[in-house]
Each structure stands twice: as C-alpha cells, then as structure tokens.
Amino acid sequence: MIRLNVFIRTTATNREETVATAKELVAASLKDAGCVAYDLFESATRPDVLMICETWSDAKALAAHETTSHFTTLVPRLNELGELKLEKFVI
C-alpha cells in the first residue's frame, strides 16, 4: 500500500475555497478503484494548514488516480490557492 500525506498551506483569503476544493477532491477520489482511504483534516493549531491523507492499494491505482479528471482539474486549483507539500510512504 501507498500512503500520501499532502500538506496544504493557504491564506485566510483563500481558505474557504481551498477547503471546498479539497472536499470535492476527497469525495471524487474515494470512488476511484484502489482507494483505501482519502481524508481531509484541518489543523487545530494553524488555521492556514490542511492535510489530505490518502491510502492506495498499490502504485497502479495511484497512477490511475493521477490521470482522472478530478485530479487533473482540482489539484492544479489547490496549487493556485496555496502551497502543497507531499510526503509519500510505502506501507
């Protein structure tokens, strides 16, 4: 399995749209084949930080997810709204 922790740092101005966009990505991604988990967390200590935790069954499922229309549309939008940092783990 593969685990991705994606940290999103945004601004107060962009926060509402960032959360809405991330929620849209989560809802669509949960339907992708091989998605074990896909969750959005809002930091309790830093209002400018969100985290998406993704778990994929394997590299093939993750690669397929990265070609979906929701990924290719919403991830670039999240990049416009904030700064993304990705940590990838193999379970």
Map each language-model feature to its residues.
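Glycine-rich beta-strand-turn "strand-cap" elements at beta-sheet edges
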Residues: 2, 40-48, 73-91
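Short, well-ordered beta-strand segments in beta-rich or mixed alpha/beta enzyme
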Residues: 2-9, 39-66
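Generic alpha-helical hydrophobic packing signal
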Residues: 7-9, 22-25, 84, 88-90
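Short amphipathic alpha-helical segments
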Residues: 14-36, 70-73
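Residue-level signal for well-ordered alpha-helical positions
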Residues: 21, 41, 65-68, 77
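Generic structural signal for secondary-structure transition and capping sites
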Residues: 27-30, 34, 61, 83-86
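Short conserved AdoMet
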Residues: 30, 57, 79
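Acidic-histidine catalytic/liganding microenvironments
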Residues: 32-33, 46, 68, 81
